[in-house]
Structure formats: C-alpha cells, structure tokens
Curated annotation (Swiss-Prot):
This is Membrane protein insertase YidC. The keyword Chaperone applies. It comes from the Bacteria. Signal peptide: none annotated. The gene is yidC.
Length: 544
C-alpha cells in the first residue's frame, strides 16, 4: 500500500464519518410556521411531576451580576430570561448571548417549585404562588461577592414560603433555596422540583448552524444518574418518557457551547423525568423525595441551577460529571487530553490559532517514528512489485495459493504489508477528536487567529484555507511515488485534492488550519525520510 491508496482510504473513512455524524446527531425538524402562544410560567407535567396549573402573569424582576442578566417571574419564581454578559450573541455584536428566553416565538425556561399534597404549586390550588419582593431589580454592586434575591409567599393557612436566589460574582451556578415556616396546626407534605422547559422547534433567530452539516451539533436533553455518568435524551426520545430514581446526578438541556442544568442537593432519592408538553414544548426535570414538615417547625429545601457556558473545570466543581456536557462524542478520551494540552499551550502563546499550530507540530513530532516506518514499509512494498507481478502471472487465478505465497514473500523479505496503515489509523482519530474539540469547546467560540480568520470555530468566510489545504494535498500527491496502474484509481487520486477541498469548505477554520500545517509537516518529513531511504537504496527521486 502506498500513500496514494492511503489518501483514498482517508477519503472513504472521512465520508463514512460524515454520514455517521449526520445519522447520529439528533436532527430536530425545522421550525414550523405555527406561532407559539405567549408563554406563561405554567409547569404542565405528567404523573411523575404531578403538574402545576397555568396561571396569570406575575411581576418580572431583573437580576444582574458581572456575568449574568436574568428575568424572574414572581408568579412561581421561574427564570424566564437569561443573558450571558461575557459572550456576544454573534461575532462582533454588542448584544449578549440569549440563553433562556420567553417570547411568542420561543420558550426556554428554568422552573422550580414545591408540589406534593400541601405544596403551593399543587394543581389543586388553581394557580401558582405569587411571590412578593422588596424591589423590582437587583444588581451585584462593585466589591460585592454575593447577591441574594428573596421572594416571599404567604399561603391562606398562614404558612410562609421564602424562595431565595443566591448568585455569586463570576459564577454561573445559582443556589435556589426554599425556607418553609409551617405556622399552621397541620403537618405539610412537600416535594421540591426543578424543570427545564424548551420549545422543540427552533425559530430562525436561534437556528445558527443546522444547514451546515459540518457544524451541526447536538441539541436536546441529557442527565447523569447513579447508573449513567452521562446520557443524552433527545426530544424524539421523550416520546417514550424518562422516569428513573437516583440518589445522585443532574438533568440538563444542551446546545452547542451552552447548557442549563438542575442539580438536586437535598438528601434522598430523586426522580428524573421527561415529558412532551403542549405548544410543541418538551421538558426534563427532577422531583425530590417528599418531606414532612411538622406543625410549628421550619425547614429548608434547595437545589442548584447552572445557566451558562460549558466551562469544564467550573462545571466539574458544581457537580460530578457535569463537565461531560461538553460533547466530545465517542472520541472524548482523545479530545479531552487534546483540549487540556491546547489550553496549556494557550496559556503561554495567548492565541488559540497559534496554539493549534503548536499542537500540530507536537502531534506530528510524536508520530514521526511511525511516519518513518510507514514510508519505509511502502518503499519496501514498491521494490516487491516486480516479484508480485511475476507471481500473479505464474499462479494465475488461484487466489488461495497466491495469498499463501504473498505472505511467504513478505515474511522472507521482512515486510509488513499493513505497515503503511498504522499512522493513518492513529491520525484519523486525532483528526476527528480535534473536530469534536473545536465544535464543543466554548473557549474556541469566536476565538480569532489572524488576518481574515476571526472565529476558529466557524468556516473560513472566503474559503482561502480550504483551497490552501487542497494545494498542499496536491503537492503531497505529486511528490509521492505510486504503484497504482488501474486507470480508475489514477483518476480518483487525481481528483482527491479537489474532493477534499470541497468537503473542507464548510469545516471550522481551526480544523482546516490543523490539516494545512499537518500537510506542510508531512512534506518536510517526507523529504527527510526519502533522503534516508535513498542512501539505503529503497527510494528513487524519479517518479514511476
């Protein structure tokens, strides 16, 4: 096998990967033209969540820290809007990224409350509790490390419920604390729940990548439990519904680079559930174990809500395995070390593009012994071609005998016929792992390189990098000796750089840059190896 056939194999593997990616990724149907009714903060669930009735609109209060801007509805105390102040909506925009949203076109909310026999969110009440706050807006002041938003509701029986949101400087994790003061003469049975509700169809203003097969990523629910560290649960999976009991874990809604998640913190078993709601919406949530609060006593119930970017180290500190929401696909065990190395290099270099170039040199340097072995094996195979051709003419159509004598020849000449494949087998997972890393790491979102490349996670707007990549492939092809004699294979190999260029037109520019640098390193290593092979009589500069 020579380098020409290796390119053909790469193309086959590449096409296979893209077809698999298209099949594996949950592709939700395009947004319908049906208008979603103005969303209320109703929590309409199945038997698992017991449901909460629809209700009128409460007062909207605003909460702002250095990294978050939230809108909370006093009717139920749900988070209806969330802007991430450190992340622009699109490249070059002054508008912050809009994660949670409640509009006529799209609904994405983080809901929480107390259901159960005596819960204020029990459907039998007819409406959700209307909390009272001391002010309409809250903002983290300079020098302040923590912001508390207390909301109070007093039920008809005199029981006081205080729901407090606690936000910290620089943190995307919110503590949601319930303090229940049972001043009634009867015990209370309450169940804490947290739910993430989202419209299944994306409106045009939020659909930023579904038309690009190379940039399409997972959007849907996920959870972690005692049995599964990380499991996706797509909108289509919700037709069957999730209903499990676990002593640990979290539930989440995911999209590229960003996530929301409820992490139960109350001791005891929790029920995780999903459901399809009305108006084309779906939900994933948790229900804590019921608690009994005796008459005249007080008790606290709480949970943690993550609303923000998928920053691995910060998410891991909030809950075990929450960092796995950074979706690196089935090659996560390669992507994660690659990202750690890339982040380490970025700490010294200060530019993600140059860090990718540096990691390319490191990877190709580590693989140089295998690359050298590959070219040596291919050179020996080329020298055996006359003997193999004579063997074919002598043996004819007896395939079994031909195979036996070929293996005997390889053994006597100390040639491994698969020796040229090993570097390819290793390079392809690294290439695909880098693809997942670029598509899943929020640190690379809108990361500039130089000149016209302002976002390494997006395609080259002028297609210059894919064309340069095709040129480097062409030079590698022209400089590589070949034993391909079949006219069809020769024609395929001639068009291979063009085919790859077309494929890479829509790929992240950071990935294309990696491939360009890798090709340039290949050209340098190729010339160095060929000089050594010439001295051993295993290579000639004349291309046959």
């Amino acid at each position: 096998m020579d380098s020409q056939r290796n390119l053909l194999l790469i193309a086959l593997l590449f096409v296979t990967f893209m077809l698999w990616q298209a099949w594996e990724t949950d592709k939700n149907p395009p947004a319908t033209t049906q208008t979603i009714q103005q969303a209320t903060n109703a929590v309409t669930g199945d038997a698992t969540n017991q449901g909460v009735p629809a209700s009128g609109q409460g007062k909207l209060i605003t909460v702002k820290t250095d990294v978050l801007s939230l809108t909370i509805n006093t009717r139920g105390g749900d988070v209806e809007q969330a802007h991430l102040l450190a992340y622009p909506d699109i490249l070059g925009s002054d508008k912050p990224f809009h994660l949670l949203e409640t509009t006529s076109a799209f609904v994405y909310q983080a809901q929480s409350g107390l259901t159960g026999k005596n819960g204020p969110d029990n459907p039998a009440n007819g409406s959700r509790p209307l909390f009272v706050t001391t002010q309409d807006s809250f903002e983290l002041a300079d020098g302040q490390s923590e912001l508390r938003i207390p909301m109070t509701y007093t039920a008809a029986d005199g029981v006081t419920y205080t729901k407090t949101f606690v936000l910290k400087r620089g943190d995307y994790a919110l503590n949601v604390d319930y303090s229940v003061n049972n001043t009634s003469a009867q015990p209370l049975e309450l169940t804490l729940f947290g739910q993430l509700k989202q419209s299944i169809d994306l409106p045009k203003h939020r659909d930023t990548g579904s038309n690009n097969f190379a940039l399409h990523t997972y959007r849907g629910a996920a959870f972690s439990s005692s049995e599964d560290k990380y499991k996706k649960y797509s909108f289509s999976d919700m037709d069957e519904g999730l209903n499990i009991t676990t002593n640990s874990g979290w539930v989440a809604m995911l999209q590229q680079y960003f996530a929301t998640a409820w992490i139960p913190t109350t001791a005891g078993a929790n029920t995780f559930y999903t459901s399809k709601l009305g108006n084309g919406q779906a939900a994933i949530g948790f229900k804590a174990a019921p608690v009994i609060i005796a008459a005249g006593s007080q008790q606290n119930l709480n949970a943690t809500l993550w609303v923000g970017p998928e920053i691995q180290d910060k998410m891991a500190a909030v809950a075990p395995h929450l960092d796995l929401t950074v979706d690196y696909g089935w090659l996560w065990f390669i992507s994660q070390p690659l990202f750690k190395l890339l982040k380490f290099l970025h700490g010294f270099i200060g530019n993600w593009g140059f860090s990718i170039i540096a990691i390319t040199f490191i990877v190709r340097g580590v693989m140089y012994p295998l690359t050298k072995a590959q070219y040596t094996s291919m050179a020996k195979m080329r020298l055996l071609q006359p003997k193999l051709q004579a063997m074919r003419e002598r043996i004819g159509d007896d395939k079994q005998r031909m195979s036996q004598e070929m293996m005997a020849l390889y053994k006597s000449e100390k040639v491994n016929p698969l020796g040229g494949c090993l570097p390819l087998v290793i390079q392809m997972p690294i290439f695909l792992a880098l693809y997942y890393m670029l598509m899943g790491s929020v640190e690379l979102r809108h990361a500039p390189f130089a000149l016209w490349i302002h976002d390494l996670s997006a395609q080259d707007p002028y297609y210059i990098l894919p064309i340069l990549m095709g040129v480097t492939m062409f030079f590698i092809q022209k400089m590589s000796p070949t034993t391909v004699t079949d006219p069809m294979q020769q024609k395929i190999m001639t068009y291979m750089p063009v085919i790859f260029t077309v494929f890479f037109l829509w790929f992240p520019s950071g990935l294309v840059m990696y491939y360009i640098v890798s090709n340039l390193v290949t050209i340098l290593q190729q010339q160095l190896i060929y000089r050594g092979l010439e001295k051993r009589g295993l290579h000639s500069r004349e291309k046959k």
